[in-house]
Amino acid sequence: RLETQGIRDEEFIRGKAPMTKEEVRTVSLSKLRLTADSVCYDVGAGTGSLSVEMALRAHQGQVWAIEKKEDAVELIHRNKLKFAADNLEIVEGLAPEALTELPVPTHAFIGGSSGNLKEIVKLLIEKNPQVRIVINCITLETVSEALETAKEFGFEENEIVQLGAARSKAIGRYHMMMGENPIYIITLQKK
């Protein structure tokens, strides 16, 4: 059972699908505040790195990875097997339609919305008005859309964290810090 977040990026099987980096995963998981029996969605799951860590944290619950790209779905299957994330279910499809038949979520992570953020959030709160949602945004337009959506649906407990991580890279006998793309982590939950 996973006691802390932060599986190293190198441990995941990767392809061309985007992967939430370790530092961002760790903060995003912290903001989700999962419990052992959480029922979680990972929308736009990519490689499944966050899905796997969610499943290991919510080991008595359920995690649903939703991904539209076939090659990424295959990576999620491979990472599920590698990390023995038996409570991780994988749904190939586009949200929000792919979410309609899933069980009621207690938590949802949105890493990719394909332009359907408002519709996804609407469906999540229809299923559970108290769902805790964490959204990762790489563009200012998505941040704006997330905040407009939060206001429209009456979320009072909103938090935005901007994370800019850098990693060292060896340059001969020296080390240089190489910045990762900055990311906005938005947490939504109704009181």
Q: Could you describe each region identified by the protein language model?
A:
Residues 47-59:
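Conserved SAM-binding loop of SAM-dependent methyltransferases across substrates and taxa
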Residues 66-105:
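S-adenosyl-L-methionine
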Residues 104-112, 119, 132:
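Short SAM/SAH-binding signature in class I
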Residues 44, 56-62, 127-129:
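Conserved S-adenosyl-L-methionine
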Residues 67-72, 112-113, 138:
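Short beta->alpha hinge that forms the Motif I/post-I loop of the SAM-binding pocket
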Residues 123-179:
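C-terminal substrate-binding/active-site "lid" region of AdoMet-derived donor-dependent transferases
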Residues 1-36, 41, 75-78, 82, ...:
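Class I SAM-dependent transferase core
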